[in-house]
Amino acid sequence: MGVKQRVAAFSLFRAALCLWLLCGRTSGKPVRKCGGANPCGSPGPPVVLIPGDLGNQLEAKLDKPSVVHYICYKKTDTFFTLWLNLEQLVPVAIDCWMDNIRLIYNRTTHSTSSPPGVNISVPGFGQTYSVEYLDPSKRSVGMYFFNIVQALVDWGYTRGDDVRGAPYDWRRAPNENKEYFLALQGMIEEMAEKAGGPVVLIAHSMGNMYTLYFLNQQPQAWKDKFIKAFIALGPPWAGVAKTLRVITSGDNNGIPVIRPLKIRSQQRTAVSTSWLLPYAHSWPKDKKEVRETLGGQEELPEDWNTTAKVFREAGRRVLGVPSGRKMEEMTWWWSPKIQEINPRF
């Protein structure tokens, strides 16, 4: 789902969401706005926002041994915005961006790392700015959680206090983001203790999978004490069919200057992409999930009726994987390790 669609979905939902959050304090009366000469306390429980895939800013600092183009920066003294930076998504410059944001998979450790000399950081944990706007310049194309945050602020919440963001490295699956979950747990506990009551978690898209994964690791006593509610916006509980297109032919998320096939190589390196593939435990074994054309091939054969078969053949025909070798030995995104971390209810 593109940024514009996300904003539309949030706008439709925010009125009902905020009424639910505030119903315990308002008793049906209109909510008065706060600020300036009209201060007031928090109107409801603390709120934590967990973004989806591509849903928060990423920054990078470079000290690379080599670059893919002479125009690419090889070394930077400070961190700069990697996502969302529209200036880096234009032709030629996008090659620099892709080389910086990609992940390298280690088939031995089943873990990923950034390219040599690339240091990626996630700005704004505990704040809201990096989830309100994906582009620090606050261009409308990068507006994300802004409408929800601003509505909460108008009703008495304070940015960075009782409404906070929990951004993360969305390129990775949750098993590689353990430090993030420890920080999230600590922030939830801090907010609950300060407010004298539990916290509301609001997640969008893949953020719901991250949230569910996090909650499944917590004992019931912890959840009873610190979590008031978990509000799921657009949760992909059964996986995302669009992921098939992302990996087989690429997806530009509606950005016209980016060719899908150009961005495909980077999208394939993100472990989170494979994590969103339709989950085997959610679909009948005989359900056909794909009937499309693939590259220069004719219509997919009749027996390509499962995700597994699609990717075996896609890898062999499109990626040039030798037919005598297992896919998991050639491409990280077919590794059974990915399926092992799927969240369950």
Per-region residue spans from a language model:
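C-terminal subdomain of alpha/beta-hydrolase-fold enzymes, centered on the catalytic histidine
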Residues: 301-345
